UniProtKB/Swiss-Prot annotation:
Adenosylcob(III)alamin binds at D57, E58, V59. GO terms for molecular function: cobalamin binding; D-lysine 5,6-aminomutase activity. InterPro entries: Cbl-dep_enz_cat, Lys-AminoMut_A, Lys-AminoMut_asu_sf. The lineage of its organism: Bacteria, Bacillati, Bacillota, Clostridia, Peptostreptococcales. It is an enzyme of class 5 (isomerase). This is Lysine 5,6-aminomutase alpha subunit. Pyridoxal 5'-phosphate binds at R187, T188, T189, G190, Q191, S192, S241, Y266, R271, N302.
């Protein structure tokens, strides 16, 4: 069952019990998810049907279409039904229909509804076109890996965050030439809270760059070009968290992104987005990512920036179990689950390195197929660049000793400023030195029987199992109200975006769920 040799002497019966509890939690929540849709799920359907662009006021056409249907109390049937019916009635394309709605020339909800079977058949046939494009993107990615080969060992993941997509491209190309394997374009501060996706190439962001489809296209093009120069496929990463999770997943699938931040709980805890909204949105976004071959990264590392990494380690493991089960329900295979964790214990903690090693090895053994995402120290980086570089070196050592996969490079200037190109070069050099010098160390080391490292892992697993038992009894929504994750309490009916949640009609239809889950 477990392909990774167990060095921690973990109780795998307990692992299976914990996994079963997480599955029960996910299935319980999934019942709620499947009875509801949201405005952004329906906007994602519009985008996947080919609706794009903005009106004269810069309002995206998918928003105009979905708001129009919602105002006329029709969203419970799904946008696909109204668009397909309008195509049958008018002979126009979805894009032309959206433009007609924007111009006030068409009311989708007043058109005579054709036979429902005919409408669903039309929606399905229209959806197949985009699904084929996404399949094609997946095969392009696979053929590039066949051509260049894929790297074994940790992937060096770096971020660019200038606010200007053209400057981001300059920095990303430099990072790729320095040895980066994954480029993540950080989003501008607050984009999570926009209930629409901006349009076009952007040059003004704060702490990051707007996620737009054009920005995705530009960066993908640049990375393909530099990838051909350096002889490897450079993975591109962005963020589908916030109020537009499935829309950004759809845009990423269309533009061939490779990695997406896509956590089931992050938006609830750290962006105060309503929990009902987030749970529905994460499901469709993961269906899209699963189908597109995109690796998702989850955000457990964020718990450790608000809660103590030593005391709350079990909440990270419990969340990893839950994220895994929600991903499986959305058809996302284990090989695409970049479950997150982080090297965030206080450097003053005695034996802290051993505890970090235990936690990382435990994640590796419990999720043997997952391309685990391991985050660098940030919370206890002080601006002392020399100590910071050493903290990052210890983090790099844990990665290679425990075979982490997606290795987010720490920056020596963390807590001072967003990284300069020179900072990135030093961080890449630090990691490459350690990964090369210690390449086979994980095959050479065992942990002392009943020693500190084994005992710590057993203790964290037991606590995670107890927590999952508690969550199973309470249900996920009540658990989030109690503040168990990251010490953050959120009300079930509070937060942003609840007014965008709609109950489905019995004739509701989303053709992409059917096509993508039955791949």
């Amino acid at each position: 069952m477990i392909s990774v040799e167990s060095k921690l002497n973990l109780d795998f019966n307990l692992v299976e019990k914990a996994r079963a509890k997480a599955k029960a939690i996910a299935i319980d929540t999934q019942e709620f998810i499947e009875k509801h849709t949201t405005v952004t799920v329906e906007r994602a359907v519009c985008r996947l049907l080919g609706i794009d662009g903005v009106d004269t006021d810069e309002v995206p056409l998918p928003n105009i279409v979905v708001d129009h249907i919602k105002e006329n109390n029709g969203l419970n049937l799904g946008a696909a039904m109204y668009i397909a019916n309008a195509v049958l009635n008018t002979g126009k394309t979805p894009q032309e229909i959206a433009q007609a709605i924007s111009a006030g020339e068409l009311d989708l909800t007043k058109l005579p509804m054709k036979d429902l079977f005919e409408v669903k058949t039309k929606a399905l046939s229209m959806a197949k076109e985009t699904v084929e494009k996404i399949k094609n993107n997946r095969s392009i990615r696979e053929s590039r890996f066949e051509e260049y080969g894929d790297k074994s060992g940790p992937l060096l993941y770096v971020i660019v965050a200038t606010g200007n997509i053209y400057e981001d491209i300059t920095q990303a190309v430099a990072a790729a030439k320095q040895g980066a394997d994954v480029i993540a374009v950080i989003r501008t501060t607050g984009q999570s809270l926009l209930d629409y996706v901006p349009y076009g190439a952007t040059t003004e962001g704060f702490g990051g760059t707007y996620a737009t489809q054009e920005n995705f296209r530009l960066m993908r093009e640049a990375l393909d070009k530099v990838g051909a120069e350096v002889g490897k496929y450079i993975r591109l990463c962005n963020y589908c968290s916030g109020l537009c999770m499935p829309e950004i997943a759809a845009m990423g699938a269309i533009e061939r992104l490779d990695v997406m931040l896509n956590d089931a709980l992050y938006g609830i805890l750290f962006r105060d987005i309503n929990m009902q909204r987030t749970m529905i949105d994460q499901n469709f976004s993961r269906i899209i990512n699963g189908f597109a071959g995109v690796i998702i990264n989850t955000g457990e590392d964020n718990y450790l920036t608000t809660a103590d990494a030593f005391e709350e380690a079990h909440t990270v493991l419990a969340s990893q179990f839950i994220n895994e089960q929600f991903a499986l329900l959305a058809g996302l295979p284990e090989e695409q689950m970049g479950l997150g964790h982080a090297f965030e214990m206080d450097p003053e903690l005695k034996n802290g390195f051993l505890y970090e090693l235990s936690q990382a090895q435990m994640a590796r053994e419990i999720f043997p197929k997952a391309p685990l995402k391991y985050m660098p120290p940030t919370k206890f980086m002080t601006g002392n660049i020399f100590k910071g570089h050493i903290q990052d070196a210890l983090f790099n050592m844990v990665t290679i000793m425990t075979n982490q996969r997606i290795h987010l490079l720490g920056m020596l200037t963390e807590a001072l400023h967003t990284p300069f190109m020179s900072d990135r070069a030093l961080s890449i050099e630090n990691a490459q030195y350690i990964f090369n010098n210690m390449e086979s160390i994980s095959e050479e080391i065992q942990f002392k029987e009943d020693g500190l490292i084994q005992k710590r892992a057993g203790f964290v697993l037991e606590k995670a199992n107890e927590l999952l038992e508690e969550i199973e009894q309470l249900g996920l929504f009540d658990t989030l109200e109690k503040g168990i994750f990251g010490g953050v309490k959120r009300p079930k009916d509070g937060g942003k975006g609840l007014n965008g949640v709609v109950s489905k009609d019995e004739n509701y239809y989303n053709p992409f769920v059917e096509l993508m889950l039955n791949k």
